[in-house]
């Protein structure tokens, strides 16, 4: 294909996906559908890119991190690595697919909320190795300065993001309390 064509309506032509009734993408009551748009969309996008040979799996999750107490509440999505492609490395520490958002600047986060961002760094070695390397994820350590409840909704904690064209899988994510 010619990758140098200008953006036009043909580039945005939708595809039709035919699904069986009562599957993960067409859940029927009383199936649990929490985070149906956030986490499922990441898996669907990675699956489509993989099937088309466009790129290996990205972090495959929005890493939805929610915490708070009666006074303060905060919700953020944490970045990770993007998948490598047939002729390019993945990017480190980026939001991918549906996430497409920015993190709050650490100074603003600490000013607005009773938290201390102790570290935020690239997790070296977490991107899948290969001729073209998958992007590395991150390590983020947050200290609560007041009692808080916290929840993380994330994928790829057991099954790693898949590699492509002989490349290794990426590392699974980890959550520590």
Predicted regions mapped to residue ranges:
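Glycine/proline-enriched, intrinsically flexible loops and inter-domain linkers
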Residues: 1-177
């Amino acid at each position: 294909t010619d990758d140098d064509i200008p953006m036009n309506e043909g580039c945005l032509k939708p595809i039709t996906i035919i699904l069986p009734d009562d599957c993960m993408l067409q859940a029927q009551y009383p199936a649990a559908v929490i985070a149906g748009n956030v986490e499922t969309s990441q898996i669907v996008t990675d699956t489509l890119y993989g099937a088309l040979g466009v790129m290996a799996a990205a972090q495959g999750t929005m890493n939805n991190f929610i915490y708070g107490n009666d006074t303060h509440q905060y919700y953020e999505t944490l970045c990770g690595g993007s998948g490598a492609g047939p002729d390019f490395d993945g990017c480190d520490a980026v939001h991918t697919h549906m996430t497409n958002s920015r993190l709050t600047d650490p100074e603003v986060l600490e000013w607005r909320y009773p938290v201390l961002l102790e570290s935020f760094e690239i997790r070296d070695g977490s991107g899948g190795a290969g001729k073209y390397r998958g992007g590395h994820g991150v390590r983020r350590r947050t200290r609560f300065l007041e009692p808080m409840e916290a929840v993380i909704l994330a994928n790829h904690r057991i099954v790693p993001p898949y590699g492509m064209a002989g490349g290794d899988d990426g590392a699974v994510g980890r959550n520590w309390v």
